[in-house]
Structures are given as C-alpha cells and as structure tokens.
UniProtKB/Swiss-Prot annotation:
The gene is queA. NCBIfam families: PRK00147.1, queA. This is S-adenosylmethionine:tRNA ribosyltransferase-isomerase. HAMAP family: QueA. GO terms for molecular function: S-adenosylmethionine:tRNA ribosyltransferase-isomerase activity.
Length: 353
C-alpha cells in the first residue's frame, strides 16, 4: 500500500493543544472492527465496554524532560532532544544546530548555560553526549530539561505539562513522548475498573522521538521502523495466557502496548514469551495479530505508522471511515485529544486498501 493511502484532511482547530480539565472526561469513539459500526461515547463508558476478567495492558513508562537548549562553546545555538539514556552520564540525542557539533565539541546546556557536556561520537542521526556534571542524567534532566511536547502542539511547554503529559501510573523514566492512550485514565476510573473485576498488567516501552518522524517512502513496505526498548516480564505473559484461557479479551492501552505484546509474541515459538530488548516491529495492513483483541488509542497523524497500525487492527476501510466521522463530529486529535475503543477485525489482514 502507498503511504498516501493513509492521508486525511484535518482542520487545524481539531488538534488539541491542551488536555481536558479531567483526564477521563474525553470523548470515546467506539469502532466495531468486524462490522465497522461506530458509537459516540465518553471515556468512562469503558466501564460498560469491559467485562470482568478482561485484561488491560498498560505501558508504565514515564516521560523525561528530555529537551535542553543551549549553545556550543565555539558559538551557535543548539537544541538537544535526548532519545535514550545510556548510563548516569551519557545519552544518545537528536541535535539541532546550524552546524552539527563534531566529536570533542564542548556544549553549554540549560536555560542558563550552566550544564557542561561534550559531544563524544556520532551514531548515524544520533549524537552521543557526555554530561560533565555531578548529577546523574535523570536528575539533571528533571532539574533543567523541558517536556518534549510533540511538534504539532505548537507551543512552549509549561509547568503543568510535567504532570499532564504523564500517565498517573507511569513509573519507569525513559520516554520522550507519552503513551497517550493512557493519559485518559485517572485514579477513580482505575479504581472502578478494578472493582468491576477488570485485570491489569504493565509492560514498558520507552517511546523514542522516532514516533514523530514522517514516513519518507512511497510504499509502506519500504519504511524502516525506528527502534525502541521494551520489556514484557513473565507476570505479563502469565496474565495474558490466563486471560485467554478463561475466554476474556486482552485490551492494549495504546499502540506501544500493542507493539510490546506483539514483539514478545514474535520473539518465541510459543504464543507469548518474556521480552527484554529493542523492538523495531512495524505493524501495517496484512499483519496477523497474535495477542491483542481490543485497542484503546488516540487519533493519530495522517500518513503515520500509528494510523497504519490501527488500520491493520480494524481494517483499512473501517479505520478511514471512522476518522472521517471523527473529523465531521469535531473530535479532538493527537496526544492531548480524544480516544477510540476498537475491537479487532479478523478480516483486516486480508485487506489490500
């Protein structure tokens, strides 16, 4: 299929720049993957959609304040977006500058240029930086970094984003973008779901900046997916297998949970096996899902790998029809926007656009 097949018109005013005042107050567009039927709901209607014994799988990563501004000692402004923390002193980062720093270049980062760093080496598009600071990397970023809001939010980050651009259950720092489907869950909703008997499990996938990179090929099969670190521990495997055995559904909260679970399924000969490592799994039309039965997700960018994943799950025609309806009904799009509840379309893998 062509990347252009996943384009759709989106008025600028439907891009959410700020979240709802209450996390769980967003709208929810439910899509029956098998029939294409749509229902307009609110997010707390999950209580009716989910049955006792269903398993919600969350991504418990936390967003780090990964953006730093500064300058090269030799002159010239610089912007650093940390992609991956290597150890207490080193990171891999995207660097924006009029002229890329060379190995050995000294940098002064932070709003007051107080953080000394050195460009150690270049690894393809990423720069290895070493911080010459008494603090470890995560403490340093927490003290001086900016929240890495997506480009389409198109405003500077503010103090409130440090809380709002995090899930309430995130506990593993390492992402440069939020697993946004999880932003809609607040403590009262989680408590109500537990009281109903809905099971919960947590994977980890540290979202990289590659999630915002455009697909630069014409045919989606030619796209090279970025790599991200994921963990699916044994207790998640056990919870998934128990859920399947009792005839309930595995409900992935977000595309990152999908990619984690399906990576674990692809890694072993069994249906699912523990997984700890990098994944570059690219899910698009034709993919045979092995684990996930239901997907909760936000509305994604045109021509993005994320809308391709949704299309592989619900079916291309059903997905594009749902997006057209969402635009017509003025749903809010992208990270701070509204959500979808999608049941898997077993016929989706046979579609070809």
């Amino acid at each position: 299929m062509r990347v252009a097949d996943f384009s759709f018109a989106l008025p600028d005013n439907l891009i959410a720049r700020y979240p709802q005042a209450q996390r769980s107050a967003c709208r929810l567009l439910s899509l029956d993957g098998q029939t294409g039927a749509l229902a307009h709901q609110v997010f707390t209607d999950l209580l009716e959609e989910l049955a006792p014994g269903d398993l919600l799988v969350f991504n418990n990563t936390r967003v780090i304040p990964a953006r730093l501004f500064g300058r090269k000692v030799s002159g010239g402004k610089i912007e650093v977006l940390v992609e991956r923390v290597l150890d207490d002193k080193r990171v891999l980062a995207h660097v924006r500058a009029s002229k890329a720093p060379k190995p050995g270049s000294a940098l002064l980062l932070g709003d007051d240029d107080s953080i000394a760093a050195t460009m150690v080496a270049r690894h393809d598009a990423l720069f290895e930086l070493r911080f010459d600071d008494a603090r470890d990397v995560l403490t340093l970023l927490n003290d001086a970094g900016h929240m890495p809001l997506p480009p389409y939010i198109d405003r500077p980050d503010d103090v409130a984003d440090r809380e709002l651009y995090q899930t309430v259950y995130g506990e593993r720092p390492g992402s440069v973008a939020a697993p946004t489907a999880g932003l809609h869950f607040d403590e009262p909703l989680l408590a109500a779901l537990r009281a109903k008997g809905v099971e919960m499990a947590f994977v980890t996938l540290h979202v990289g900046a590659g999630t915002f990179q455009p697909v630069r090929v014409d045919q989606i099969e030619h796209h090279q997916m970025h790599s991200e670190y994921a963990e699916v521990p044994q207790e998640v495997v056990d919870a998934v297998l128990a859920c399947k055995a009792r005839g309930n559904r595995v409900v992935a909260v977000g595309t990152t949970a999908v990619r984690s679970l399906e990576s674990a399924a692809a890694a072993g000969e069994q249906a699912l096996t523990p997984f700890f490592g990098d994944t570059s799994i690219f899910i698009y039309t034709g993919y045979q899902f092995r684990v996930v039965d239901v997907l909760i997700t936000n509305f994604h960018l045109p021509e993005s790998t994320l809308i391709m994943l949704v299309s592989a799950f619900a079916g291309y025609r059903h997905t594009l029809a749902a997006y057209r309806e969402a635009v017509a009904q003025a749903y809010r799009f992208f990270s701070y926007g509204d959500a979808m509840f999608i049941t898997r379309n077993p016929a989706a893998a046979a579609e070809r656009g």
